[in-house]
Each structure stands twice: as C-alpha cells, then as structure tokens.
C-alpha cells in the first residue's frame, strides 16, 4: 500500500513508497522481509527521496538508553531509534559530557555511525566503542569494534561492505570521565568560561544562527562534504584565493570549506524552482515547495559545475539521495 514519504524526510519532496514498516523492537527484524528494493531510514534528516520509491522503507524506531559507570569512563548503550540531540542533552543533564560539539545534529543514533557524524572539530568515531547490527542475510545479531567500523570523514563500513546488508541496532559510546574540551572552531574560542554546558549552548546558538530549522523550512542540513585536498593543491589555491578557509587534515592534506566555495562562486540565494541555496548558509539547500527531484539534481550539478570551474574542486554531496529503487550519486560533468 502506497505511503507518503514527504513527512519522513526533512527535505520534504513529494514522494511515496510502495510499503512502509516501522521497527519498534528487534524481534521484528527476524521476520521482516528485506526483499530488494528496500531503504533503511532513521529520521530522514540526511536522506532525500528524489522520486516515488518502488520498494519498502524500513524506519528504525527502537528506544532505550543504558548507562554503565566504569573506572575511567561511562559506557552509554543506545538503541538505534533514539534521537541524537536528545541523547546529548540528557547525558549532559546527568553530568556526562563529551558530545556537546555534536549537539543539535538532527537524526537518530543508529544513523550517526553510518556517516560518522561530526561538527566543530569532533567526530563520532572518537567515542564509539562498538556497534551492534542485524545481519540481514544470516538473520543474526553481530558486533563491530571501533576499528572494524572503518570510520573515515563522513564514512564507515556501513556505506561500503555492509551497505544494505546490516541494520544498526545499538551504538555503544565510551565517554571519558576526564572532560577534554575541543575549542578549535570559531565562536568556541571566544568562550569566557569553558564548561560543557557553555560549549553545548554555544554550539546550539551557532547552529541555529547558520542552519534553518528543517521542520519550518525543509532542508537536509549540510548538503556537501568539505573537500579534502593535498597540501600542494591548497598552496596553489592560496596564491589566488588567499582567504580560503582551510583546516589541517592529517600530514599531507587539508580540508577546505565547501560553504565558502559555494558562496564565493556567487550562489547564495540562487534558485531553481522552489529549491534555493540558503541565503545565510551556502552549504545548505532549502526547499520552498513545488519542487521535484529533477530540480534538486539540476541544482546539485549547477553548484558542482560552478565550483569546479572556479577552483578545480568537484564537490561531493553528503546527503544520501534515493531514486526510484536505490541510492544514487550525482556528479556534474566538468567542462573541458
């Protein structure tokens, strides 16, 4: 039976799926049919359905948080359907800090390891002890340790070897008792009093000032990854674009700000149908309605082409795009 997907993903394109299933307990996974095509979903804050989906959308809605105190840290075991920001907030209220840089990131806990969420100098991988998942083929529950998750920048094994083969059920986080603030980004450096609560509140204030609320103005958050380029490439760019924001990423690479690249290409406020490059934050695309998946694809390609022609950098979308039966990747053909 057809089910609307418009309220199930925050970009809110008009679309529907053939069947919709909500998983409230893990026993359901053992009897659930995973006949392709199927799409696993949390809160849909990093997913856009471009067209009607011909398969089954399976939403993880399991709940539960367990806290175990150990000698030097707290082990936090969280069900996949829990809201991420609510977890951060509730842990801080219990005087268990560590995740405050990741406050207000939308979505569920189960979706967080898939793309190794990160913000303001901190990535989730720093705190993951292990991830439990349901093996779709074998119908068994298994566990991966941190190294086995193969975390990278907005990346993990769940995007590759275990893509469409695993359903994350529980995430185990280890939060050290000795709090070590990460203040490397912008406004956090200006804090008068450095406390977990102060960092938490500043991160929320900063995100609210830059990012529109997806439930009042549909969007999928940061749409493009910040490109990682070689030190040599950065040096060449800085000779022409001296104010290009960049951050060291390992010994041989730097990360550059995708939002700055888009803004400097003159694309703030650029619009195709009801889809617009947000006027306050160029890294965000917003949907004013009356838009189709084809409009979003055209916008992505226009941004990629504009940035590539100016900086010789091809932007990669961070948001997961779903067409009628599978995930897809959009890349503009660079002009020779």
Swiss-Prot record:
<dbReference type="Pfam" id="PF02873">
    <property type="entry name" value="MurB_C"/>
</dbReference>
<dbReference type="InterPro" id="IPR003170">
    <property type="entry name" value="MurB"/>
</dbReference>
<dbReference type="GO" id="GO:0051301">
    <property type="term" value="P:cell division"/>
</dbReference>
<dbReference type="InterPro" id="IPR006094">
    <property type="entry name" value="Oxid_FAD_bind_N"/>
</dbReference>
<feature type="domain" description="FAD-binding PCMH-type">
    <location>
        <begin position="1"/>
        <end position="178"/>
    </location>
</feature>
<feature type="active site">
    <location>
        <position position="318"/>
    </location>
</feature>
<dbReference type="InterPro" id="IPR036318">
    <property type="entry name" value="FAD-bd_PCMH-like_sf"/>
</dbReference>
<keyword id="KW-0963">Cytoplasm</keyword>
<dbReference type="InterPro" id="IPR011601">
    <property type="entry name" value="MurB_C"/>
</dbReference>
<keyword id="KW-0274">FAD</keyword>
<dbReference type="GO" id="GO:0071949">
    <property type="term" value="F:FAD binding"/>
</dbReference>
<dbReference type="InterPro" id="IPR016169">
    <property type="entry name" value="FAD-bd_PCMH_sub2"/>
</dbReference>
<dbReference type="InterPro" id="IPR016167">
    <property type="entry name" value="FAD-bd_PCMH_sub1"/>
</dbReference>
<dbReference type="GO" id="GO:0005829">
    <property type="term" value="C:cytosol"/>
</dbReference>
<keyword id="KW-0133">Cell shape</keyword>
<dbReference type="GO" id="GO:0009252">
    <property type="term" value="P:peptidoglycan biosynthetic process"/>
</dbReference>
<dbReference type="InterPro" id="IPR016166">
    <property type="entry name" value="FAD-bd_PCMH"/>
</dbReference>
<comment type="function">
    <text>Cell wall formation.</text>
</comment>
<feature type="active site" description="Proton donor">
    <location>
        <position position="222"/>
    </location>
</feature>
<comment type="pathway">
    <text>Cell wall biogenesis; peptidoglycan biosynthesis.</text>
</comment>
<protein>
    <recommendedName>
        <fullName>UDP-N-acetylenolpyruvoylglucosamine reductase</fullName>
        <ecNumber>1.3.1.98</ecNumber>
    </recommendedName>
</protein>
<keyword id="KW-0560">Oxidoreductase</keyword>
<keyword id="KW-0131">Cell cycle</keyword>
<dbReference type="GO" id="GO:0071555">
    <property type="term" value="P:cell wall organization"/>
</dbReference>
<comment type="similarity">
    <text>Belongs to the MurB family.</text>
</comment>
<dbReference type="InterPro" id="IPR036635">
    <property type="entry name" value="MurB_C_sf"/>
</dbReference>
<keyword id="KW-0573">Peptidoglycan synthesis</keyword>
<keyword id="KW-0961">Cell wall biogenesis/degradation</keyword>
<dbReference type="GO" id="GO:0008360">
    <property type="term" value="P:regulation of cell shape"/>
</dbReference>
<dbReference type="GO" id="GO:0008762">
    <property type="term" value="F:UDP-N-acetylmuramate dehydrogenase activity"/>
</dbReference>
<keyword id="KW-0132">Cell division</keyword>
<keyword id="KW-0285">Flavoprotein</keyword>
<dbReference type="Pfam" id="PF01565">
    <property type="entry name" value="FAD_binding_4"/>
</dbReference>
<feature type="active site">
    <location>
        <position position="154"/>
    </location>
</feature>
<keyword id="KW-0521">NADP</keyword>
């Amino acid at each position: 039976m057809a089910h609307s997907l418009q309220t199930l993903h925050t970009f809110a394109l008009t679309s529907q799926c053939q069947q919709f299933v909500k998983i409230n307990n893990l026993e359901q996974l053992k009897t659930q049919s995973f006949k392709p095509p199927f799409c696993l979903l949390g809160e849909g804050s990093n997913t856009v359905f471009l067209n009607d989906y011909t398969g089954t959308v399976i939403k993880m809605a399991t709940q539960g948080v367990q806290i175990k105190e150990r000698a030097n840290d707290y082990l936090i075991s969280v069900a996949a359907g829990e809201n991420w920001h609510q977890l951060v907030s509730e842990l801080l209220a219990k005087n268990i800090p560590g995740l405050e840089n990741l406050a207000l990131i939308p979505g569920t806990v189960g979706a967080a390891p898939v793309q190794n969420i990160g913000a303001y100098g901190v990535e989730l991988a720093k705190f993951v002890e292990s991830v439990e998942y349901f093996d779709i083929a074998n119908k068994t529950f298994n566990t991966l340790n941190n190294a086995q998750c193969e975390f990278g920048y907005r990346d993990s094994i769940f995007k590759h070897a275990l893509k469409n083969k695993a359903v994350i059920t529980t995430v185990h986080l280890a939060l050290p008792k000795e709090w070590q603030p990460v203040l490397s980004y912008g406004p956090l450096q200006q804090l008068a009093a450095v406390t977990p609560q102060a960092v938490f509140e500043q991160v929320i204030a900063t995100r609210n000032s830059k990012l529109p609320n997806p439930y009042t103005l549909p969007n999928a958050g940061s749409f493009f990854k910040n490109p990682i380029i070689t030190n040599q490439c950065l040096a060449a760019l800085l000779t022409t674009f001296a104010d290009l924001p960049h951050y060291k990423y390992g010994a041989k690479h730097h990360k550059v700000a995708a939002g700055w690249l888009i803004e400097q290409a003159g694309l703030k406020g650029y619009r195709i149908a009801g889809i617009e490059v947000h006027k306050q934050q160029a890294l965000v695309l917003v949907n004013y309605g009356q838009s189709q998946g084809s409009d979003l694809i055209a916008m992505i390609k226009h941004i990629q082409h504009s940035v590539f022609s100016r900086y010789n950098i091809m932007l990669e979308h961070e948001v997961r795009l779903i067409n009628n039966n599978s995930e897809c990747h959009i890349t503009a053909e660079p002009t020779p």
